Amino acid sequence: MDELLNVASHAATFATNFALKHSISFAGKLAVQQVSSYIKRASADDQSELESVKTQLLEMIRVVTPAIELIEIMSVGENENFKSTKQLVDSLHADIEQFTKHVLSAAHSEFPPSSEKETLQKNVDTSILREMKTLLLKINDAVPLLNLSITTSGASISSSLPKSTSFSQLLRANSYIYRANVAFTGNEPLQVGPTFFLRTYKIIDNHAKSGYISNDLVMWKEEMPVCIAKMFRMPPQRLKSKDTVLAYALSLKQSFDDDRYHDEDETPVTKTISLNDVRTLFFSLSGKLLRLDDVQTPVLLLKYADDETEYSSNTAPSNWIALEALPLVSIPNESLDESDELAESLSDSEAARLQLLGIKKQESVAKKKSSFPSTIKDQPNLTLLEYLIRLCALESTTQESVLQLPDEQIALYLKDYQGRERPRDPASYNALENRSELSASPGSVSSSRHSGIFATPTFLSPWNIKNIPLVTPEVSTRQTKNVDEEDSALLMASPSVRKSNLLPQEDLISKDSVIKLKENPSVIPHSEPESSSKVINCQAKLNVEKEKKNP
């Protein structure tokens, strides 16, 4: 859905692209680890040279990793400046993976005991050493091209976080991930963070093929009126890749407790989205900006693929899903799991207070379960889910804990790839109303009755946009043109004219105001004629002032 991607990219949304595969840092570290394992069984004559080349390769990978990861993420964001450079990055990535496989096979190969064993081992050592030097040479040749590509594109690697970052939600999400990683055993999926209650939307299939519907119109359909969303860390044995250790998935399950009629044979909709398949995350401050006309609250929009093979083709279709946080809704106890999920729902302040009181967590959970209300208060907001997705996707891509990653790498997954900012508090956002005379925003698809909404510029303060007048682009252009013409005429005028225009106007209310008013009657507004007595008194005062000046 290119039109939806275009709309979401130019609306008041906050978009982040995720890398398609494991990062280059993970591939490089894996290659170095395999080389280290191989060196231990290599011949004594070749160990020193292999160790020296391995050190050079490791340092070079560490240096170029930030630049390569920046190019990978920016190229996913449809940045045309990185299209050609992305091919070079993919080639380096493939060379590193191929080298890792070769070293791995050589490390596990066993030679039969014979007189030729030393000769065979020597040949393998020579082959590994030659491949390491070739890979090091390729990386050295690619460094100037990577530097040139980043410089010309204007992209930069910065460790500073966006001003709109909600640090409380970010730290809370990191705390949930850390506790889940500590408790993870590797046998069963483990929930990360609390349970979210959402409403999901999907795009109507094949709507663009209809001859009665415009191709630029994106039509949404409510999929799950009440959705129970949970983030899980998946065990390695359930993953396709054997090298993957950290993997997360977002589980979406429909709840029939939505005050709607459902058939007896109807089954709830369930969906599991692996974060390895998520390509782009959009955070919109209003669903209207994504053409969800009935949604005025913040919305998360995910673009993902069904699996890795499907997304490998450029023409492969992508799936879209919109997530809206539900207000305070009534969810019966049966919708929740047992005490372990209730324990996860305990806030950090509650856990600290119970620890000071000496109350065990299990006892508190039992009390909480017995008196659990039918209405859930203080539900986790959509921002917390957003940060959970971002941080879990980062761990899944780098195969490292967030606590071990540098600031620059974390900042890449928390920033908008177009450099935009959003208000920290979504409730303070005020979208401009739909006007029929307004045209589509720049870069978006043509306007329609479902998409004629103008997004508030995200660089403006949300408290200063209420009184901004709504003007059409034609009027705005005409006003700007008139101002430019006036400025040009003033610059081309004589110095005396410019000086008179630039000097401040003299105040009419001064000691000589009566004389000026008499000499310039045109500046006096039209009013009722004064009485004859007042005119005589005014004339007498003028005569007295003249006599004082000229005795």
Swiss-Prot record:
GO cellular component term of the entry, any: nuclear envelope
Cellular compartments annotated: Nucleus
RanBD1 domain span: 1-309
A GO molecular-function descriptor: GTPase regulator activity
Keywords: Nucleus, Phosphoprotein
PANTHER family, A to Z: RAN-SPECIFIC GTPASE-ACTIVATING PROTEIN 30-RELATED, RANBD1 DOMAIN-CONTAINING PROTEIN C584.03C
Protein species of origin: Schizosaccharomyces pombe (strain 972 / ATCC 24843) (Fission yeast)
Annotated stretches, region: Disordered: 522-551
Signal sequence, renumbered to the chain: none
Superkingdom: Eukaryota
InterPro entries: Ran_GTP-bd-rel
In-chain residues carrying the UniProt-annotated modification Phosphoserine: S441
Main localization, broad class: nucleus
Pfam (any one): Ran-binding
Protein name, entry field: RanBD1 domain-containing protein C584.03c
Entry keyword annotation includes Nucleotide-binding: no
